[in-house]
């Protein structure tokens, strides 16, 4: 589907279980797409009490303000990208879309992509209402049969609502294997991947592998060794063997995202 310039893609990150890395993946994706791939975007943090995006930006900002040297180094790095940091809208599920509309009215041109970080448990009436306003939803899953059952149920519900509800925007729902242990058996993963395909539930080909690198913020890695940061993409040296770059390419392909100079 060809995207209209003033009709942004709404991408939601949702999960049925806390701790699956939903927000970390959304943060990494946003930074790579915005700073490296030159895709205009904004983030809506409606993750309840967690507010992962908002609090990450706060930690980044506080650290920069307390360290002039780090602030100077970060400013020099940002100048290479030729842009300011992406905007984060602090919101709640029931007013997330209206808050986005207010943001649009302040903009000359709407961004290409809006990323919504959902609360950790999506089966509430407010979350179901928000889910069907998305164009796409990405739901990270882990190799745990109990949590997989609830994740699959949510995916089926959204798929069926998207088909049967006239006001739905939903185009596709993607499951994503996350925190995969390279040394562990893939029996559960292979079994549930096949089960997802049989149920008609799309699943990314890419798998994201478990790594302590995902926890490296600006305070631990500095500008040259950071992985999670709202002002910078993950350091290139930290990405091999994580699956992140392969996944970002797959996201761009599935969502038909274009770099700004090719839009």
Residue ranges and their predicted role:
Residues 14-20, 34-114:
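P-loop/Walker-type NTP enzyme "switch/lid" segment
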Residues 125-145:
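Inter-motif core of Ras-like GTPase G domains
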Residues 179-229:
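Beta-strand-loop-alpha "switch" segments that mediate conformational coupling across diverse proteins
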């Amino acid at each position: 589907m060809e995207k209209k310039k003033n009709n942004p893609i709404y991408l939601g990150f949702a999960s049925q279980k806390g701790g699956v890395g939903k927000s970390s993946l959304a943060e990494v994706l946003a930074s790579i797409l915005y700073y490296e791939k030159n895709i205009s975007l904004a983030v809506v943090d409606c993750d309840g009490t967690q507010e992962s995006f908002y609090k990450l930006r706060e930690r980044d900002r506080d650290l920069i303000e307390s360290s002039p040297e780090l602030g100077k180094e970060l400013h020099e790095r940002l100048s290479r990208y030729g842009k300011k940091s992406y905007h984060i809208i602090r919101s709640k599920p029931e007013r997330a879309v209206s808050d986005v509309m207010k943001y649009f009215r302040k903009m000359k041109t709407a961004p290409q992509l809006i990323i919504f970080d959902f609360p950790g448990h999506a089966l509430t009436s407010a979350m179901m209402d928000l889910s069907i306003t998305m164009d796409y939803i990405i739901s990270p899953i882990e190799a745990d049969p109990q949590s997989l059952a609830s994740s699959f149920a949510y995916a089926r519900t959204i798929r069926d609502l998207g088909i049967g509800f006239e006001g739905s925007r939903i185009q596709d729902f993607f499951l994503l294997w996350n925190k995969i242990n390279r040394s562990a058996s893939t029996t559960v993963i292979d079994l549930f991947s096949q089960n997802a395909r049989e149920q008609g539930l799309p699943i990314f080909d890419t798998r994201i592998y478990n790594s302590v690198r995902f926890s490296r913020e600006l305070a631990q890695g500095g500008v040259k060794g950071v992985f999670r940061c709202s002002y910078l993409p993950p350091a290139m040296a930290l990405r091999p063997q994580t699956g992140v770059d392969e996944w970002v390419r797959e996201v761009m392909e599935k969502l038909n995202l274009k770099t700004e100079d090719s839009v």
